[in-house]
Regions:
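GST superfamily/GST-like fold recognition
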Residues: 1, 73, 83, 106-176
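Mobile beta-alpha loop/short-helix "lid" or hinge segments that flank ligand
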Residues: 2-13, 90-98, 132-144
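Anionic-ligand binding region
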Residues: 74-80, 89-107
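Active-site-adjacent loop/tail segments of enzyme domains
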Residues: 55-85, 111-113
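Short acidic-glycine loop/turn motifs at beta-strand connectors
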Residues: 59-61, 94-98, 151
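Structural motif
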Residues: 48-49, 85-86, 90-92, 129, ...
């Protein structure tokens, strides 16, 4: 399947903030963000299947954002150390201004107790790439060593529930 990645023209932080003020929980906020992303692209690409996805991280009722620098990544890893956190995912497909598929799931991730030396070495290896991930770790790289246990779909941890998505695309005869 050929595809094109198009950045959505939305203010994620503002949408997240507004939805939280409205009293919505992580699942609803993730869905609102995924829908807003897909909708912003779908408006410019009618008759096209547009996939929007979002992932939130919640630990002990605290919502995390992507770290903005290595120092904030360090602080985030210190807060996640030894804790179980949730990755809350939502993926939405829009075609012709209509949501035709939605999928949500939550993954529980337990992090090892991390000492400052391990965090420092990890950040030195990964560099600013950790700022692309809400958890400041990349499971597909050295970040796997930080985790004690994962309960959930591997692809969803990476940000896209690939197997359910492929199932939908096959059911719609888009994949053969």
């Amino acid at each position: 399947v050929s595809f094109q990645a198009i950045p959505p023209g939305i203010d994620e932080a503002a949408i997240k903030h507004e939805r939280k003020l409205d009293g919505l929980g992580p699942r609803e906020v993730a869905e609102a963000l995924a829908t807003a992303k897909a909708d912003s692209v779908a408006r410019e690409h009618q008759d096209t299947i547009v996939i929007g996805s979002d992932q939130l991280l919640v630990c002990n009722e605290e919502w995390f954002d992507r770290p903005t620098c290595l120092d904030s990544a360090r602080k985030q890893l210190e807060r996640l150390s030894g804790q179980v956190h949730q990755l809350v995912n939502s993926t939405v497909i829009i075609k012709n201004s209509t949501a035709v598929w939605k999928y949500e799931n939550t993954i529980n991730v337990e992090m090892h107790e991390l000492n400052s030396d391990l965090i420092k070495k990890y950040l030195a290896k990964e560099g600013r790439a950790v700022c692309e991930s809400v958890g400041a770790y990349k499971l597909e790289g050295h970040g796997a060593q930080l985790l004690a246990q994962v309960d959930g779909d591997f692809f969803s941890i990476l940000g896209l529930p690939l197997l359910p998505l492929l199932g939908f695309l096959r059911a719609q005869d888009i994949l053969r």
